[in-house]
Amino acid sequence: MDPRETTDPSLPPGPLTHLSLPDSSEVRLQSDGPSLLGSWTRSPPEHAIILREGVRTCLQQRCEQTVWILHAKVAQKSYGNEKRFFCPPPCVYLAGPGWRVKPMQDQALQSAETGPTVCGYMGLDGASGSAPETQKLNFEEQPDSREFGCAKTLYISDADKRKHFRLVLRLVLRGGQELGTFHSRLIKVISKPSQKKQSLKNTDLCISSGSKVSLFNRLRSQTVSTRYLSVEDGAFVASARQWAAFTLHLADGHCSQGDFPPQEGYIRYGSLVQLVCTVTGITLPPMIIRKVAKQCALLDVDEPISQLHKCAFQFPSDTPGGAGTYLCLATEKVVRFQASLCPKEANRALLNDSSCWTIIGTESVEFTFSTSLACTREPVTPVPLISTLELSGGGDVATLELHGENFHAGLKVWFGDVEAETMYRSPRSLVCVVPDVAAFGSDWRWLRTPITVPVSLLRADALFYPSPFSFTYTPEYSALPRLPNAQEPAPDADTLLESIHHEFTRTNFHLFCPT
């Protein structure tokens, strides 16, 4: 509480939040340049006013640009002259309205030009100083306004001895301006799918409940016939062009479809599972996942599932003892296939080629930024990524530590349209002072509901980096001013307000991101 505000009895007894900025903050180091390691920085007042208006416009107009890289967790190595192209192929989506909003300095330059507004080149990160081959991406606009590009001919040869690598995406704007270089998550290199019985002693290649997977089918093991399970127009399809990532959940057979409690643990054959599209949220009914060998579903196998295993998905049946129906593709449609029991082995069901799927784990990484404020032609990368927030302190002052990657000394933390004093610690840590809630409006003293503001980062050249995080201020109880002839409050009003006070006298932060 600020002691100066208690001298006037007409004022309420203190702020409605336990987070406030002490006066000593005014004499801290102020600078609009990159901060030194361990020093607090804030933009000068004359710059802060301009920046605040620009950040407010960014937040209101939603002019962000997102680069989304989607790829498999593992890649099979190629030997000799063979080329085992990555399957599913790495793909890139460009999303957000900012791709259609050009910075002022580029509008005149690009108005007379035609052709794609951005070009992409994807390859493997370099090994031992060698220049990796890259593949050009041809972006196509999707019905949902996203741009889609796919690298279908990438592979890793046996001359590359690495156990892990990353994909590198280079984006260039029309006119030759370098937008940036973006990296994927780590990809594990394997020689071939494991044929041994899997054990939970080595979980490196096992698939856990809640992880993301892709499913594809190859008729007669021919690469040209590859079809991927995907979602289009609200329906499941088998696509030769695009693939989707699905969250694979262990399901509870006693719950209704779409209302199952997620369970932890590694997925085993014979488990009841449910596939949920990570983009649309559309689900398939709960199904039993079966191991496939020689085009037969093995009904008595319960070992853990491994990367690039052949599997089948059986729909639960009310008639025990039957072979059951299985998830199957028919050209581009997804249908049910009625299997039959193997004449010689009752614990096997005969399938057709279209009912046998290959399962593989997937990864994705999103980079979001906005160039609408920036007066620079510098690349937007490295894009800072926030992974977690850690709140410390309370009462008169609180600090928030941002954990993530790609941080540098030229970044400032913003709460909504309010800049926070920021200290750079390391490429994985930024610390800021939580702004006083009074900075968000003159009516803050009488608030009875929480205030939630987005947490963003701003580079020294005004390049804006939104994040999926937000920060919530929660009010503390204080008496409202009484109006003349106002009705006396109910006897239990104080008790009610006190209970609200106990519920909300905490400051919380929440992560809002797609699941």
UniProtKB/Swiss-Prot annotation:
It is found in: Nucleus. Residues 1-40 are annotated as: Disordered. Keywords: Activator, DNA-binding, Nucleus, Transcription, Transcription regulation. It comes from Mus musculus (Mouse). Residues 76-86, 191-196, 218-223 are annotated as: DNA-binding. InterPro entries: Beta-trefoil_DNA-bd_dom (IPR015350), BTD_sf (IPR036358), CLS_fam (IPR040159), Ig-like_fold (IPR013783), Ig_E-set (IPR014756), p53-like_TF_DNA-bd_sf (IPR008967), RBP-J/Cbf11/Cbf12_DNA-bd (IPR015351), RBP-J/Cbf11_DNA-bd_sf (IPR037095). Pfam families: BTD, LAG1-DNAbind, TIG_SUH. Highly expressed in lung. Also detected in spleen, and brain. Putative transcription factor, which cooperates with EBNA2 to activate transcription. Belongs to the Su(H) family. Residues 384-474 form the IPT/TIG domain. It comes from the Eukaryota. One of its GO terms (biological process) is positive regulation of transcription by RNA polymerase II. GO terms for cellular component: nucleus; transcription regulator complex. This is Recombining binding protein suppressor of hairless-like protein. Interacts weakly with EBNA2. Does not interact with any Notch proteins.
